[in-house]
Design a protein with these regions (language model features):
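Acidic, low-complexity intrinsically disordered tails
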Residues: 4-7, 241-243, 249, 333
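Catalytic cores of DNA base-excision repair glycosylases
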Residues: 32, 36-266, 277-285, 293-303
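Residues in the recognition helix of alpha-helical DNA-binding motifs
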Residues: 147, 309-312, 355-359
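Short amphipathic alpha-helical interaction segments
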Residues: 298-314
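A short, conserved structural fragment
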Residues: 314-327
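Short, cationic-aromatic polyanion-contact patches
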Residues: 324-361
Length: 361
C-alpha cells in the first residue's frame, strides 16, 4: 500500500536504510501488529465515533496530555461545546476556562481557531483531504493525517512519537543513541507500511503498541510478539543501558540541577490563566493583584517578571493586557522566537496600571 505523493510531507527523502527495508519485512510487521491490536485494543470513546470534531478534540487533547487525564475532560468538553459551531461561537475566555488544568493552553485557542475557520469557510463541515486540512490554522502534518484517518478512514500514515519509535526499531534498528533516519525519511517509509483498507486499525494499533509494549525507555522485548522480526531486538537493551549510563555520568559531572515545576514559566502561565478564569467576565486584574493570586510571596518588584509572562500570553492570544505590551525588539528582528521572563520596555510605575483579562472575543 502506498499513498499519493500529494499526501506526503514535502520532499520526503530516501536513504540506504529505508531502501533496504523489504516488502516481506513490512508484511510481517503488518500481520504481527494487527494481530496484537485485535487482542489488545483499548476501548476509548473517541474510537467509537467518526465525527471529525470529536476526533480533532481528542487529538488536540492527547498531544501533550495522558489518556487517563483526557478521558473525563473530553466528555466534559463535549457537554459544554457539543459541536464545532458551538465552539466557534463561544467566547474565547470560556474556552480557556474549560481547558484549564490540561496545560499547554494555546491548544484551546488553536482548536477554536480551527472551529471558527471551518464554520466560516466550509459551512461547519471539516475538509476530508490532507492538503486542505493542512491549510487550516494550527493544523500540522500529524493532526491533518489523524483527521483523515480517524474521522474519514483514509489509509494514510499517522506518525506520532510512539509510531516513529516502533517503525524505526522494527524496520531499521535501535533508535538510540540517535535515529538512523530523519523524520522526512521516516514519513516516506511509513507511507509504505499502511495496509490497504486497514489504515484505521493500523495507526491506532501502532500508537497503542508504542505506548504499552515498545516504550521509549523500557520496551517489553521479552514478551513482544514482534521480537522475531524486530531489527532492534538483539541490541535494544544494550543500547538503552549505554544511553542511561552516559546520562548518569553526565549527571554526576556537569548536568544542571533540576528546576522544580512550581518555579517554571509554564507553571506560572497556568496559574495566571486559572486566576483570571476565576474572575467575573471581563473583570480582569492588575499585575499586582494577579501576582498576589499566583505567588504567595509576590512583591511589586516582581512586576517586570510578571509582565514578561503576561506579554507572552498576550502574544499567544491567551490573555488580553491593557495597555498591550510592546513587542520586544528581539522578536521584531526575528532573532528570538519566544519571550518568557524578559520584561517589555515599560517603566515600573506604568506596569502598575496594566490590567489583564481573559480574551474578550
Ligand atoms: S522487540 Fe523490543 S524493540 Fe522490538 S518492537 Fe518489540 S518491544 Fe520494541
Amino acid at each position: 500500500m502506498t499513498q499519493s505523493a500529494a499526501q506526503s510531507p514535502k520532499n520526503p527523502g530516501t536513504s540506504p536504510p529505508i531502501a533496504q527495508v523489504e516488502g516481506a519485512q513490512i508484511s510481517a510487521l503488518q500481520t504481527g501488529l494487527l494481530d496484537w491490536y485485535a487482542a489488545n485494543r483499548r476501548d476509548l470513546p473517541w474510537r467509537q465515533t467518526r465525527d471529525p470534531y470529536r476526533v480533532l478534540l481528542a487529538e488536540m487533547m492527547l498531544q501533550q496530555t495522558q489518556v487517563p487525564r483526557v478521558l473525563p475532560r473530553w466528555h466534559a468538553w463535549l457537554e459544554r461545546f457539543p459541536t464545532l459551531e458551538a465552539l466557534a461561537a463561544a467566547p474565547t475566555a470560556d474556552v480557556l476556562r474549560e481547558w484549564s488544568g490540561l496545560g499547554y493552553n494555546s491548544r484551546a485557542v488553536r482548536l477554536q481557531a480551527v472551529a471558527r475557520h471551518v464554520v466560516a469557510e466550509y459551512a461547519g463541515i471539516m475538509p476530508r483531504d490532507v492538503p486542505t486540512l493542512l491549510a487550516l490554522p494550527g493544523i500540522g502534518e500529524y493532526t491533518a493525517r489523524a483527521i483523515a484517518c480517524f474521522a474519514h478512514e483514509q489509509d494514510v500514515p499517522v506518525l506520532d512519537t510512539n509510531v516513529k519509535r516502533v517503525l524505526h526499531r522494527v524496520l531499521l534498528g535501535p533508535d538510540v543513541p540517535k535515529p538512523l533516519v530523519n523524520d522526512r525519511q521516516l514519513w516516506a517509509l511509513a507511507e509504505r507500511t499502511v495496509p490497504i483498507g486497514r489504515g484505521y486499525d493500523w495507526n491506532q494499533g501502532l500508537m497503542d503498541f508504542g505506548s504499552i509494549i515498545c516504550t521509549a525507555r523500557k520496551p517489553a522485548c521479552l514478551v513482544c510478539p514482534l521480537r522475531p522480526i524486530c531489527r532492534a531486538a538483539p541490541t535494544i537493551g544494550t543500547a538503552l543501558a549505554e544511553q542511561q549510563g552516559a546520562r548518569r555520568r553526565a549527571g554526576r559531572s556537569d548536568a544542571p540541577a533540576a528546576v522544580p515545576f512550581t518555579s517554571t514559566a509554564r507553571f506560572f502561565r497556568g496559574q495566571i490563566l486559572r486566576a483570571l478564569g476565576a474572575q467575573p467576565a471581563n473583570a480582569g486584574l492588575t499585575l499586582d493583584a494577579l501576582g498576589a493570586r499566583i505567588k504567595p510571596d509576590y512583591a511589586a518588584a516582581e512586576r517586570p517578571w510578571l509582565h514578561g509572562l503576561v506579554a507572552a500570553l498576550h502574544r499567544d492570544g491567551l490573555v488580553t493586557a491593557d495597555p498591550a505590551p510592546a513587542r520586544p525588539a528581539a522578536v521584531r528582528d526575528g532573532a528570538a522566537p519566544y519571550m518568557t521572563e524578559n520584561a517589555a520596555p515599560t517603566a515600573q510605575d506604568d506596569l502598575a496600571n496594566v490590567r489583564v483579562t481573559l480574551p474578550h472575543g
